[in-house]
C-alpha cells in the first residue's frame, strides 16, 4: 500500500496500473478486478469468488519475501487460496516469489541483481515445449528490477528459463490439494 502511494505521489504508475496498460495494449477484451492482498479490507469477499475467475495475474513489488512481515504472510496465505481455486495463474517477479513460497519452495537474496533489464534470459528445453514461450526467441531480454531468486522450486515444478543472475527466471508448476 505504501509503495503504491509513493509511486502515485511522484506521478509514476503503480505496478498494477502499468501491467493493466501493457495488457490493454494487446487486447481490450480483458476485464480486471484489482486486489491488494496486503491491505485490501474486503479480502475475505474476494476469496469467496476466486473460483469464478478465468485466471489471475500477480505482478511485481519491491518487497523481499524472506523478510517475513505480516504484510508478506498475508500475501502468501492469499496465494495459497488462489492456488486452490484459480486454474491459471501468471505470477510475474514478486508474484513468482509469492507463488513459489506458497507452494513450498524457497526464495533467497540473489548473488546479483537486475536493474531495469534482465539480459540474455535463455529458454531451456522444457521452456521451448511450454506454450508460454511459443514463438519466442531462445534468448531474450525483459524489463526487471530484481534482487532475489528462487533457491528451491516447489515439488513438481519445472524451470523454463534462466540467465546468469537467476537460475530460475521462469517456472511452471501445478498445485494439488
Where are these regions (language model features)?
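N-terminal beta1-alpha1 cap of cysteine-dependent amidohydrolase-like domains
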Residues: 1-77, 81-87
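Short, solvent-exposed loop/turn segments at secondary-structure junctions
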Residues: 2-3, 39-40, 62-64, 97-98, ...
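Short glycine-/acidic-enriched loop or helix-start segments at secondary-structure transitions
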Residues: 6, 67-68, 100-102, 154, ...
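Active-site phosphate/pyrophosphate- and oxyanion-stabilizing loops and adjacent acidic/basic residues
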Residues: 17-21, 97, 147-148
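A structural signal for short, well-ordered beta-strand segments and their strand-loop junctions
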Residues: 34, 90-92, 159-161
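Cysteine-nucleophile active-site neighborhood
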Residues: 61-127
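Pocket-forming structural segment of enzyme catalytic cores
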Residues: 105-177
Amino acid at each position: 500500500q505504501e509503495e503504491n502511494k509513493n509511486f502515485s505521489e511522484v506521478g509514476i504508475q503503480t505496478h498494477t496500473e502499468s501491467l493493466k496498460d501493457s495488457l490493454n495494449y494487446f487486447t481490450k477484451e480483458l476485464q480486471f478486478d484489482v486486489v491488494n492482498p496486503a491491505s485490501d479490507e474486503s479480502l475475505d469477499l474476494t476469496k469467496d469468488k476466486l473460483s469464478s475467475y478465468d485466471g489471475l495475474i500477480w505482478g511485481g513489488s519491491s518487497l523481499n519475501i524472506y523478510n517475513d512481515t505480516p504484510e508478506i504472510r498475508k500475501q502468501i496465505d492469499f496465494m495459497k487460496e488462489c492456488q486452490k481455486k484459480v486454474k491459471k495463474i501468471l505470477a510475474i517477479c514478486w508474484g513468482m516469489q509469492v507463488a513459489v513460497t506458497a507452494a513450498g519452495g524457497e526464495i533467497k537474496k540473489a548473488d546479483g541483481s537486475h536493474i531495469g533489464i534482465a539480459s540474455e534470459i535463455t529458454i531451456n528445453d522444457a521452456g521451448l515445449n511450454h506454450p508460454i514461450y511459443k514463438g519466442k526467441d531462445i534468448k531474450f531480454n525483459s524489463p526487471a528490477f530484481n534482487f532475489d531468486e528462487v533457491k528451491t522450486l516447489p515439488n513438481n515444478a519445472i524451470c523454463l528459463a534462466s540467465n546468469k543472475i537467476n537460475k530460475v527466471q521462469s517456472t511452471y508448476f501445478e498445485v494439488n490439494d
